[in-house]
């Protein structure tokens, strides 16, 4: 019979393989988009959320690594963009930062309470074909504000820039 230790090693190895596959998958998608759009890549960094950090044995659910000097991205919403940050390596935060702004309301509450008119108006100035009833749960109004997040993360990251979208795509299931 398989020992407990062998099962744990199998799970760990499987998770490591899946996480490596995800890294390669993101790199492949980026390469296809860059080539298809005729862009030149200037800089790249990767921020992963919802994974196991085997080096520190930290399960990051809704969180990303924020090791000392590590560049990371914290998405806010589809209108306001994302924060580019550098980690402070704060052990009180498990060397982590939030993966995003966090919801003000559940997906079902957003579908119930938010209006299409308000959603459409909030996306003025950003090219998108994704604003619809099917994506209203992702409306900017469903998330905490950028200011609230900026104020909450000072112990774990230094904010170095804010990037604002000019194009947004959100698949509707």
Task: Give the ranges of each region predicted by the language model.
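A glycine-rich phosphate-binding loop feature that marks nucleotide/adenosyl-phosphate handling sites
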Residues: 8, 42-60, 139-145, 164-173
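Catalytic phosphate/nucleotide-handling subdomain of diverse soluble enzymes
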Residues: 90-93, 97-126
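Long, Lys/Arg- and hydrophobic-enriched amphipathic alpha-helices
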Residues: 123-173
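Accessory "access/gating" subregions that flank catalytic or transport cores
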Residues: 12-88
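Flexible loop/turn segments at secondary-structure boundaries
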Residues: 53-55, 81-83, 92-93, 104-106, ...
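Single conserved hydrophobic/aromatic residue that forms the stacking wall/gate
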Residues: 1-11
């Amino acid at each position: 019979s398989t020992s407990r230790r062998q099962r744990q090693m199998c799970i760990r190895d499987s998770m490591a393989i899946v996480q490596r596959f995800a890294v390669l998958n993101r790199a492949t998608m980026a390469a296809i988009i860059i080539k298809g759009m005729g862009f030149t890549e200037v800089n790249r960094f990767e921020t992963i959320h919802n994974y196991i950090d085997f080096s520190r044995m930290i399960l990051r659910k809704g969180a990303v690594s924020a090791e000392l000097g590590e560049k990371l991205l914290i998405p806010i919403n589809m209108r306001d963009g994302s924060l580019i940050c550098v980690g402070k390596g704060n052990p009180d935060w498990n060397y982590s930062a939030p993966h995003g702004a966090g919801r003000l309301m559940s997906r079902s509450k957003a579908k119930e309470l938010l209006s299409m008119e308000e959603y459409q108006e909030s996306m003025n100035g950003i090219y998108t074909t994704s604003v619809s009833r099917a994506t209203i749960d992702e409306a900017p109004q469903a998330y905490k504000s950028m200011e609230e997040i900026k104020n909450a993360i000072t112990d774990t990251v230094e904010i170095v820039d804010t990037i604002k979208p000019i194009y947004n795509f959100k698949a509707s299931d």
